């Protein structure tokens, strides 16, 4: 039998790219066949041009391979007595006691995992110089937007999520970057200082050091609750389970220093604050609904149930609303809905319950969580592909909501506010003058920036960063250059090696990456003709996009594995997604909320009816809704 297996494997090897031979040798026979399928499709016909059902099949095969070979544990897993989940039927303040086999998994200060093996870059942290890369390849020359696909609410949403998921623990040691002479005159800062990422020993032989996440990586809405008991105490009223919010304005409250009172306010701006305020109102509305159902519920009970419900609503909106607009294709519409509802769909699941299989019934509601043998975490690579600051414009366009809406519910422009005036304390002051409704409507009608080369906001190249408590630091930073440095410092592979690790064929020339002649010329100059030196962020921005995708295909494959993992590894989305844990009313609340529009309508009943023409609150509001397609979704063929 071994001889036959060896013979088959050697034959298959001839069809596999040489860069995958090493990983291929470690695969099971089944996985070798699956890699051959993925590899064959990649070479012959792009998966996104296949009929929807075949495209979904390809993505399921690819996701399986990533789950087997792209989940790398960092840090030792403590061995101890297994706890009883029944003792913790709620989300804890610091993320502990979710995984029954390891109480610390997903808690504040746990390690970032990895999707790709780390590549030590200490010898070339400054090659090419990050400020040269930022100036020649990233800095905005002319604003490029996303058309009608993605608006400023969508741009705010992803930062809202990042504040829920990830933030690296910093060291006390400062690094300084100085602009080389060749670009110094074009750099907003001639030099800047910042704290390096803290390297922490893991106790592992292979991955010796790692980084710690000072946010809880679970989808637990720590963006409004905080990642520890101290912050949670700051945001709670301790009355009827509710969180602090201005009843008069619907905006966040502020402390004596002018800092917003919410779960995470570091490096925030008015768009994120607006979403925090909206979901605090959602939490409080859940408390009221639960209290109406059962007047005997105490403050702590109401808070715990409402947090579960609100977190699930946020996760659902991200899965079947935000991501669908980000990856605007029929295949991903089907795929993201299948992640939540399964291939059998919402009607079947609502009528008959979970079908048992995650493919047929969805990840949500599975009988038990699934971590594929690797303790849950978010990853260094996940952090890298979520570098999306190019979504931000230079000004926010404030519209006149007192005027009569025009064609497609459009509104006249009355003011342009610099994004600098919408950050931190100043942003909170500016927002108080604008008001929630005007801000949300204005963001809804404004297109976000596109994730492209030479579209990184210049105002972010001279910005005041915050410490973890939201206080301004003394040193300005060049965020574009800093992001290049961070990926290198954290041993995230550069673009080509990243692709190899994700079973993607590496590029051999700049023309494989982009057709833009100017970009090719600058890439060749900055990287001295060596495609292997290309930084990941630059490659993700330069890469030709799939039609309908706002992000690169390379970034998407990290989404493919990690979007599912955030749901399937969490018992509150799987074994504990039920009436016992959520209450009957709470589960009904989650199951009947399908979009951000539903949440807006609940708290601002006239807003979308009056000013939103689009199908989703994440696409530009004056865009027409999609026309109904009579062809069943799974049978559609991409145009």
UniProtKB/Swiss-Prot annotation:
Disruption phenotype: Slightly higher accumulation of Pseudomonas syringae pv. tomato DC3000 in infected leaves. Partially impaired systemic acquired resistance (SAR) in response to incompatible interaction. When associated with LOX1 disruption; hypersensitivity to the growth-inhibitory effect of abscisic acid (ABA) accompanied by an accumulation of ABA-inducible marker genes. This is Alpha-dioxygenase 1. PANTHER family: ALPHA-DIOXYGENASE 1, PROSTAGLANDIN G/H SYNTHASE. It catalyses: a 1,2-saturated fatty acid + O2 = a (2R)-2-hydroperoxy fatty acid; (9Z,12Z,15Z)-octadecatrienoate + O2 = (R)-2-hydroperoxy-(9Z,12Z,15Z)-octadecatrienoate; hexadecanoate + O2 = (2R)-2-hydroperoxyhexadecanoate; (9Z,12Z)-octadecadienoate + O2 = (2R,9Z,12Z)-2-hydroperoxyoctadecadienoate. Its EC number is 1.13.11.92. Pfam families: An_peroxidase. Forms monomers in solution. The keyword DNA repair does not apply. Changing residue 163 to Y: Reduces oxygenase activity 8-fold. It comes from Arabidopsis thaliana. The record marks 266 as: Transition state stabilizer. GO terms for molecular function: fatty acid alpha-dioxygenase activity; heme binding; metal ion binding; oxidoreductase activity, acting on single donors with incorporation of molecular oxygen, incorporation of two atoms of oxygen; peroxidase activity.
